Amino acid sequence: MAISDWPEQDRPRERLIKHGAAILTDAELLAIFLRLGVAGKSAVDLARDMLNHFGSLHALFSASLDDFSQLNGLGPAKYAQLQAVLELTRRSLSEELQIGISLNSPQAVKKYLQLLLGGKPYEAFAVLFLDVKNRLIACEELFRGTLTHTSVYPREIVKEALTHNAASVILAHNHPSGSSEPSAADHSLTQALKQALALIDVRVLDHFVVGGKNVYSFAEHGHL
């Protein structure tokens, strides 16, 4: 049965308008995004199939076009729409950070970094450059590696910090494996970067490791 044939009070779009998005299930929210189902399935049914197939919203959002298109009714057009929504969300969070106030909230930074790095199939290392008032000057992905490794060069980060006239930095990288637990190499790198940046009076405020739904903070665990 098509959603248009459902009682009005049960339709996801009408429920969202009346009660707000927070009360809807993941499948209902996806159904609003999809708009239409396929033969024999409503948009909600198709959304449930998507969630069952990928296992989680995070896995769905991180899927490649080939993986996304495996389900009947999904293809390049829907994939492009989804990526556009995700990019708009990233940019919205980036705007919040640029205001400056959000940088005083580790949770806001974590959410932004999850969107920025969480879905990447390779290891990436990013740096947030901040001014003396902890306002974001720039966020740059400086290094990109393989599934399990990326090479980070302290001199390049020092160079960028000088270019941006940064007073402090926040370091971040992802683990495509899904684990946010830092490795021994991560700990060594953090200390090496901290020492290199201290030579130019730039503080390392935190180092976040993004792994799936979890984000590890070096500062919160007393490792800085």
UniProtKB/Swiss-Prot annotation:
Source domain of life: Bacteria
Motif (JAMM motif): 173-186
NCBIfam families (alphabetical): PRK00024.1 (NF000642), radc (TIGR00608)
Ranges where the MPN domain occurs: 102-224
Stored SUPFAM superfamilies: JAB1/MPN domain, RuvA domain 2-like
UniProt record, GO biological process: proteolysis
Annotated Gene3D superfamilies: 5' to 3' exonuclease, C-terminal subdomain, Cytidine Deaminase, domain 2
Pfam families documented for this protein: RadC, UPF0758_N
Signal peptide: none
Protein name: UPF0758 protein mma_2551
Keywords associated with the record: Hydrolase, Metal-binding, Metalloprotease, Protease, Zinc
GO molecular function, one term: metal ion binding
